[in-house]
Amino acid sequence: MSTLILIPARMASTRLPGKPLADISGAPMIVHVARRAAEAGLGRVVVATDTQSVAEAVRAHGFEAVMTRIDHESGSDRIHEALAALDPGRKVETIVNVQGDLPTIDPGIIAASLRPFEDAAVDIATLGVEIVREEEKTNPNVVKIVGSPLSATRLRALYFTRATAPWGEGPLYHHVGLYAYRRSALERFVALKPSPLERRERLEQLRALEAGMRIDAEIVRSLPLGVDTPQDLERARTILSN
């Protein structure tokens, strides 16, 4: 199975402008993400960006970058454009979308994202981590996976929500926003219009579920730090300086 890892990066973050180039231990944040993606050992790693300075920084550190349009509404749209430019011969079968603001991500969980594709019925694969901190259960910024257990380490996703769900006894799962797509699934997904539940929850993945696509989540133990604020950036600097 030929795999391409794509890392979408844009400079226009509302809470932390310019974060792809934020310095962490002497290298831009986007380069740390690319290094960890390469360590996953799945295949080619390319940063997809709309900003020339990001592309130049990535290339200066020995990684590939491809320029994309500036008007994309989502990372999925950006990686779809990048895929078409990088693989016109359609040799790539699976695409892993690694967010560009995860500089501490464990390469092992990037590799784990492909495991659900052992089932040919799965269109999109993603990751989840069991929630252990009580405050995360009610935090709307922590997206939860509501799913049917397939094994001790896998769920079939039925819904994603910012609410505390499901109700009752049992574990809750924190969704890690990393996606692996079969090529046909990515092409179908980006052709869909935003869905009602997607708009309501502000969660793009609900578009796929509402269209009848299957998403399975591999349950892992490592939760990467998403860098969205100056405070997150300082935490990442502390983690990566050790």
From Swiss-Prot:
Keywords: Cytoplasm, Lipopolysaccharide biosynthesis, Nucleotidyltransferase, Transferase. Pfam families: CTP_transf_3 (PF02348). It is found in: Cytoplasm. It catalyses: 3-deoxy-alpha-D-manno-oct-2-ulosonate + CTP = CMP-3-deoxy-beta-D-manno-octulosonate + diphosphate. The keyword Lyase does not apply. Pathway: Nucleotide-sugar biosynthesis; CMP-3-deoxy-D-manno-octulosonate biosynthesis; CMP-3-deoxy-D-manno-octulosonate from 3-deoxy-D-manno-octulosonate and CTP: step 1/1; Bacterial outer membrane biogenesis; lipopolysaccharide biosynthesis. Its EC number is 2.7.7.38. GO terms for cellular component: cytosol. Its main location: cytoplasm. It comes from the Bacteria. One of its GO terms (molecular function) is 3-deoxy-manno-octulosonate cytidylyltransferase activity. Belongs to the KdsB family. NCBIfam families: kdsB, PRK05450.1-1, PRK05450.1-5. This is 3-deoxy-manno-octulosonate cytidylyltransferase. It comes from Mesorhizobium japonicum (strain LMG 29417 / CECT 9101 / MAFF 303099) (Mesorhizobium loti (strain MAFF 303099)).
